[in-house]
Amino acid sequence: GTLPCGESCVWIPCISAAVGCSCKSKVCYKN
């Protein structure tokens, strides 16, 4: 929840979810 993964999730899910990122406020974050 604190480290941006450099990916947005406005239209599609986080591809970086594979490495533990999740969508928050239209941006993918890790932890």
UniProtKB/Swiss-Prot annotation:
One of its GO terms (biological process) is defense response. Disulfide bonds join C5-C21, C9-C23, C14-C28. The keyword Disulfide bond applies. Keywords: Disulfide bond, Knottin, Plant defense. The keyword Zinc does not apply. This is a cyclic peptide. PROSITE patterns: CYCLOTIDE, CYCLOTIDE_BRACELET. There is a cross-link at G1-N31 (Cyclopeptide (Gly-Asn)). Transmembrane segments: none annotated. Probably participates in a plant defense mechanism. Belongs to the cyclotide family. Bracelet subfamily. The presence of a 'disulfide through disulfide knot' structurally defines this protein as a knottin. This is Cycloviolacin-O6. It comes from Viola odorata.
